[in-house]
């Protein structure tokens, strides 16, 4: 039996709620709060496609809207996690919250915001050239796909490397491609967060590596996820299990990246039917984080 991970906090968006339930692994979640308060080509996508959960089909084959369910009478689930939010993606209402406004370090789930900004501001076929700064401005042990100065990938490929492999140098390169620098891109991230209604979030980088000025809340992260999953490009990437990148200096035969979100894999014991997509995260200070 595979051991359940311990998550720092959970942010979950749902398109339709029939019963308010929590996956089995959520009962073992623990967290530590901060000390201070365009369409995508599927030619290289393997195994899975996005799952539509926003409605159902009636007998005539017509789509019907997702039913809005009153959850006020449903017993609040007991979870070990100190921070979690379940948000209805259809209308933004919060169905479940536990310390939803407490600030935490998000780690790599930050990349969902990065992907959203890239999807909104870039042509997927544009070329991203990796600078020395992008490939070296990383902390020790940070996840990487081995990009070196002068390597190139398309924006499309970068998005898959970002969300499936969680490649941190790819986050840097995308930030430079969009805004010229990590600092300028972080300003765009914060402006976007504010426009989505986030009130307790501040981003300092595009990847989520440790920074005391980089934090969010379960509620704010759910708002970001709601916007991200509403974007067809991000939803397609975040729901894909494997993707093959083109050749680079360190990977002359190309590189296949695999989604780290185990709840998307039917062959994994942690698979949860109906999950559209998501992003996992981990740093030494944040612990494990998840948005789905």
Which functions belong to the PLM regions below?
Residues 198-199, 210-215, 219-292:
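Domain-terminus/edge residues, biased toward the C-terminal soluble/receptor-binding domains
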Residues 4, 71-74, 114-115, 132-133, ...:
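Intrinsically disordered, low-complexity segments enriched in polar/charged residues with Gly/Pro
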Residues 2-26:
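Sec-dependent N-terminal signal peptides of Gram-positive bacterial secreted proteins and lipoproteins
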Residues 19, 122-123, 289:
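Ubiquitous "structural anchor" signal
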Residues 27-219, 228-232:
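Active-site-adjacent loops and short helices of periplasmic peptidoglycan-processing enzymes
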Residues 10, 102, 264-265:
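A short, sequence-level motif marking secondary-structure junctions
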């Amino acid at each position: 039996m595979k051991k359940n991970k311990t998550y720092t906090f959970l942010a979950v968006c749902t398109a339709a709620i029939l019963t308010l339930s929590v996956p089995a692994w959520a009962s073992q979640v623990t967290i530590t709060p901060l000390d201070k308060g365009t369409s995508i080509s599927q030619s290289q996508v393997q195994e899975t496609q996005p799952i539509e959960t926003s409605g159902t089909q009636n007998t005539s084959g017509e789509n019907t809207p997702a039913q809005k369910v009153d959850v006020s009478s449903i017993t609040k689930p007991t979870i070990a996690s100190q921070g979690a939010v379940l948000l209805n993606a259809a209308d933004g209402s919060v169905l479940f919250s536990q310390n939803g406004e407490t600030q935490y370090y998000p780690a790599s789930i930050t990349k969902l915001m990065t992907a959203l900004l890239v999807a909104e501001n870039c042509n997927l076929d544009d070329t991203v050239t990796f600078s020395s700064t992008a490939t070296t401005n990383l902390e020790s042990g940070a996840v990487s796909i081995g990009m070196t100065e002068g390597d190139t990938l398309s924006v499309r490929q970068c998005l898959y490397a970002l969300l499936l492999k969680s490649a941190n140098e790819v986050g840097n390169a995308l930030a430079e491609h969009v805004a010229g620098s990590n600092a300028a891109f972080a300003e765009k991230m914060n402006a976007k967060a504010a426009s989505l209604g986030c009130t307790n979030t501040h981003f300092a980088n595009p990847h989520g590596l440790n920074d005391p000025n980089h934090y969010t809340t379960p509620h704010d992260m759910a708002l970001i996820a709601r916007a991200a999953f509403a974007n067809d490009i991000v939803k397609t990437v975040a729901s894909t299990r494997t993707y093959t990148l083109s050749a680079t200096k360190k990977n002359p035969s190309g590189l296949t990246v695999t989604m780290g979100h185990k709840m998307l894999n039917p062959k994994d014991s942690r698979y949860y039917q109906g999950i559209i997509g998501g992003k996992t995260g981990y740093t030494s200070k944040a612990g494990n984080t998840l948005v789905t």
